[in-house]
Amino acid sequence: MSVVEDVMVLGSDQPLRSIVRDEHLLLSPPHPPKVPVKLWEEHPPLTVVHYPQQYESEAFAPPRGVYENDEIRVEWQKLDGRQPFYHRNCDVDEISYQIGGERTLMSELGVIEFQPGDFSRIPRGVAHDNYGREDSHVLFYIPAPVTELAPAQRESGAVFPPFPGWQPGEANEAITQCMAALGHDITVFGVDEQLLLEQVHQEDRRMAVLRADPGQDVTRLYTTDRIRLGMVTTTPGGQRRYRRTLDADEIQYQAHGHRTLITQRGIVDLEPGDFVRIPLGISHASVATEPGDYVSLLSHRELPQVAETTRTADAYTPERLPSLTVEAR
């Protein structure tokens, strides 16, 4: 079967070029070499990391690192209650995507009440804390400054008290570098929590809450010269079309719906709560039989997995493709 592959680069939504491919050859191992020299490497299949979206109670634990290099860190966190300190980043903007539950973000730029599907960006140098109620969210630590590409749906506000039942008490503030990874605190000290939260009245800036446009296939939300972060909507129907990004790893988080990811590193069924990394230069397409969406992070630099693997992709077989008759981007 012939398919089209779009060759992409990080800074453009338009293909660098589009190529007609034989799908079987595209996904199959290469032909055996005709010389007695090893010409290419054996590469492992794609790996999936899964965290359940349904809240499961447990004692407070630090966020779980999922992917990380020396510039970017992707974490998954769940929270039921307060964090043990206020946090101020030295080097990164901190972007979150709300998976489920309720969460109050308290900061020097005001308070946000999150709903599932909300994105927000805490600018570098802004102190903040969270109060979760069976909450789960994904965190992206990205070198500042990050530019917002979508209009704000709402903004942080000067709310006091920040949530019902709040009482001022002993609080600490942690200053961190290296994307807030555990063990990279610079200094930790006591603060007057009420004084910290009242700083909002001295600030002109507010934090924007962004959401994906369900009417668009791709909603670009945040960008720098080295990353793009957005949301991709998948709908059944259409012809299968492949994408190969030449200069960026892609991290995908399956937010809603089920789909099958077909790649040159194997085929894997994805469900809500799955993370997967597609290395740069790997051709891939998605097949969906139900509506869904996923968060997409494109990173110009390799972004290795640091979490334990939940499962791996299956090797391509010609028998698998005939059942995959529905395409999604």
Located regions from the model:
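Short, conserved beta-strand element in jelly-roll/cupin
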Residues: 78-79, 88-107, 141-143, 233-234, ...
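A generic fold-level signal
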Residues: 67-71, 90, 133, 224-226, ...
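Short acidic-glycine-tyrosine-enriched beta hairpin
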Residues: 108-127, 264-281
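Ligand-binding loop in jelly-roll beta-barrel domains
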Residues: 124-155, 271-272, 280-309
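Non-catalytic C-terminal interaction regions
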Residues: 3, 64-65, 277-278, 286-329
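Polyanion-binding and phosphate-handling cores
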Residues: 55-58, 63-76, 82-85, 91-92, ...
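A short, N-terminal "cap"/entry segment at the start of jelly-roll beta-barrel domains
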Residues: 1-76, 83-85, 155-230, 241, ...
